[in-house]
Amino acid sequence: MEENLADNSEREARPSKTKRKKEMHALQNIGESLVRLDSRRLIELGLPDTLMEAVLEAKRMSKHGALRRQMQLIGKLMRDVDAEPIRKKLDLWGNSSAESTARLHQLERWRERLMADQQMQALSELGQKYPDADLQRLRALARNAVKEKLANKPPKSFRALFQELQKIIPAATGERPGEGID
């Protein structure tokens, strides 16, 4: 009877096989993320030598079976490493990429509005939000970009308009054109 109690308490202290497998798959997924990173970011993580070598080896592999086995090895090596700082760093890099993409979309929306029929409204909104903006230059660039598009010419002013908007609109803002105006 006492042996059964000892066995039960030992089983409760140990995670179930399913839970262990989920943890191993999570570590292997982190390993897959490591393989997709560029070398500069890998160095920034400061991984142990054995793990770094395994990741670099996986980057060179092209055969599916060999790559799968290498990913399992990386998952196994990840067990000996504290994965939380690596996970946090990967999340941080993923979010910064998403923020960068969101900013580019925001700038593209402004450019499209400036080139559309509602140009005067868009210019007045830009003038209210960003008083330092050179509205006359933006209007000229937008007008030239529309002319280039209609004439099927290279999009020189189209690009220049985007670059001018990048200078005017700070990176920290995430608003959409037309939002936030009272």
From Swiss-Prot:
GO molecular function: ribosome binding; rRNA binding
Residue runs in coiled coils: none
TM segment ranges: none
Subcellular locations according to the entry: Cytoplasm
Primary localization: cytoplasm
Example GO BP: assembly of large subunit precursor of preribosome
Swiss-Prot/TrEMBL keywords: Cytoplasm, Ribosome biogenesis, RNA-binding, rRNA-binding
GO cellular component: cytosol
InterPro entries assigned to the protein according to its UniProt record, in alphabetical order: DarP, DarP_sf
A Pfam match: DarP
Disordered, as annotated region: 1-25
Function: Member of a network of 50S ribosomal subunit biogenesis factors which assembles along the 30S-50S interface, preventing incorrect 23S rRNA structures from forming. Promotes peptidyl transferase center (PTC) maturation.
NCBIfam families noted in UniProt: PRK05255.1-1 (NF003593)
Family indicated by similarity: Belongs to the DarP family.
Name of the protein this chain belongs to: Dual-action ribosomal maturation protein DarP
Source species: Nitrosospira multiformis (strain ATCC 25196 / NCIMB 11849 / C 71)
Biological classification of the source: Bacteria, Pseudomonadati, Pseudomonadota, Betaproteobacteria, Nitrosomonadales
